[in-house]
Each structure stands twice: as C-alpha cells, then as structure tokens.
Swiss-Prot record:
One Pfam family hit: Ribonuclease_P
Name of the molecule in the record: Ribonuclease P protein component
BP GO terms, sorted: tRNA 5'-leader removal
GO molecular function: 3'-tRNA processing endoribonuclease activity; ribonuclease P activity; tRNA binding
Length: 136
C-alpha cells in the first residue's frame, strides 16, 4: 500500500500531470511523469477504466500497479508526479509483464525529462488548490 503522501488524490493533480507530463506507452500501461519540487515526496496515481475489465480484474490490475509503484519509490522517492493508465491488455498480463512494462515506461519518461529533473517550483502541489489559494 502506498502512503498517503505518495498518492495523487485530486483531479487537478491528475489532469495537470497528464496534460503537462512526459508520456510513454507500452502494451499494458501508459505513464505520464512530471517533475515537481525536489523536496516533495514522489506521488503516484492510477487510472484503471472499465475497458480493462470487471471490478475484480480492475482491482487486481490496480493492486499489481500499486506494488510496482511502491517498488519504484525506492529509486525515485522525491521530486516526481506519476500517473499510470492501465490499458485493456493489462487485464491478461502477468505480474512480470506489468512490472516490465511499468519499469520500461518509467525509465523512458525519466530520460525524456532530462534537464527538467526536480525543480524548485511545483507543477503539482499539495499546498494549492485549483484557484491557487493555500489549503486550510
């Protein structure tokens, strides 16, 4: 299970990461990654739509992707926001296939970020809402 500080939870955070992030797709997943403040913990969010399968299958895919995300936090513990979108093929994929696709897509997005690795100003920030005012 991912700690609360390591999860993307608001629709604003998801949409900002998907719109402005670096994207890389594989057979089973599409990853969007954006650099946030270097001192913020990395945060991961998951999108698993009904096209992946029924509730049982979707939850299995989410559990596997959450574990892959937790493993990646050991290497990229601070400074990134990541959104993982599961594709319909993920329903039939084994753990090894999902993990390989996740890691390959993550490595590619990190390389593409290049000089944009963690920056001082956060694109996705826990302290601001959509209007830009501090949270209470």
């Amino acid at each position: 299970m991912l700690a609360t500080r390591n999860r993307l939870r608001t629709s604003t955070d998801f949409s900002t990461t998907v719109r402005s992030g670096v994207r890389n797709g594989r057979r089973n997943v599409v990853l969007y990654t954006v650099a946030i403040a270097a001192d913020e913990p990395s945060r991961i969010g998951f999108i698993v739509s009904k096209s992946v399968g029924n509730a049982v299958v979707r939850n299995l895919v989410k559990r596997r992707l959450r574990e892959a995300g937790a493993l990646s936090l050991q290497q990229y513990g601070t400074g990134f926001a990541i959104v993982v979108r599961a594709l319909p093929a993920a329903a039939a994929a084994s753990w090894d296939q999902l993990l390989a696709d996740y890691n390959a897509a993550l490595e590619t997005t990190m390389k593409r970020l290049g000089g944009r690795l963690p920056r001082a100003a956060s694109v996705v920030s826990r302290e601001t809402r959509q209007e830009g005012t501090p949270r209470a």
